[in-house]
Amino acid sequence: MFSGCTALKNINIPSTVKDISRGAFRNDCNLTSIVIPNAIKVIKDNLFDGCSKLNSITFGNGVEIIGFDAFRKCSSLTNVYLPDSVRYIGSYAFHMCKSLCKVSLPKDIKTVSGSAFVKCNLLTAIDYRGTMEQWKTVSTRSTPINYKNKIKVIHCIDGDIKI
């Protein structure tokens, strides 16, 4: 679709769009911001993989799934606030986002692949908008959430979990 396009800088996807093809914006090296509408439920695999200048993502309240490598190598991304609708973050979703230092997860998330934040070396903590007891029910599959990164703590609304 737009993969490898160098002219795109900002994308505001129309609210009528319900689906975007896998890898559609892959390696769009000048893309800096994206607004994802409420109608999009799945951020498909590799959708923004390699968008090295992407520094702003506004997620619609309908997003439920973040796919494999969805934001891999988005090296300018510093903050990610996932809406309450997100239930699943796939493997390597934010792999090698070397500037990522803040992530906020919704309380009703079910699965965060342990490899989702591999090589996000500035990310030392995750903000979880649920309780410590609720965090215990979040699956990281077979890999711990601090796999190949520097995450040391999960900040919950009622305290911290050191890992």
Task: Report residues per predicted region.
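Consensus positions within tandem repeat domains that build extended binding/scaffold surfaces
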Residues: 1-3, 21-26, 44-49, 67-72, ...
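Structural signature of tandem-repeat unit edges
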Residues: 5-19, 29-42, 52-65, 75-88, ...
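A structural signal for leucine-rich repeat
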Residues: 118, 138-143
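Short mixed-charge
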Residues: 145-147
